[in-house]
């Protein structure tokens, strides 16, 4: 209404936004939805010549220490599970141990780097806020080639477990 420029940044993930990890279908599906909704919103705002930018942030290229694995601890009683879990929640320490057991080191991206990607992306009015990553670029290329050639997915990765 005011005509002032604005910018919306929606957060996705390489897990789902680029290609899913096979062991996390619910998470991957929501992150794929973030990308699609953002693309549609971008197009809709362009059609009405709104001065509102839209971006999709892919934080990373590695894991961020955001507390995601401990988010269940702050769940209020209102949103508590009606049936208790049969298995405990996975901790970041358990994920690190699983990765190490699978021969893969877990790497972290400082949140300050992600903040820089966001600020630079907003200033450049960039839709894709994606830090450089050889692994990510290769996954995108393989997914594109799979789709283009109508081949079965060969780019999918599994969560070590």
Label for each model-derived stretch:
Residues 10:
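Rossmann-fold scaffold of SDR-type NAD(P)-dependent oxidoreductases
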Residues 18-25:
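Active-site loop immediately N-terminal to the catalytic Tyr-X3-Lys motif
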Residues 30:
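Active-site helix of classical SDR
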Residues 33, 40-41, 45:
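Conserved alpha-helical elements of the SDR catalytic core
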């Amino acid at each position: 209404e005011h005509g002032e420029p604005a910018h919306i940044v929606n957060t996705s993930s390489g897990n789902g936004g680029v290609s899913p990890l096979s062991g996390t279908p619910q998470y991957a599906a929501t992150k794929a939805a973030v990308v699609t909704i953002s693309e549609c919103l971008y197009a809709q705002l362009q059609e009405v010549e709104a001065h509102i930018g839209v971006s999709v942030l892919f934080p990373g290229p590695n894991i961020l220490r955001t507390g995601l694995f401990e988010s269940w601890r702050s769940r209020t009683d209102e949103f508590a599970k009606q049936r208790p879990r049969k298995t405990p929640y996975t901790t970041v320490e358990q994920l690190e141990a699983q990765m190490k057991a699978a021969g893969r080191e877990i790497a972290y991206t400082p949140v300050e780097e992600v903040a820089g990607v966001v600020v630079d992306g907003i200033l450049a009015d960039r839709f894709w806020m994606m830090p450089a990553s050889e692994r990510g670029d290769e996954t995108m290329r393989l997914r594109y080639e799979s789709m283009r050639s109508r081949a079965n997915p060969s780019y999918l990765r599994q969560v070590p477990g």
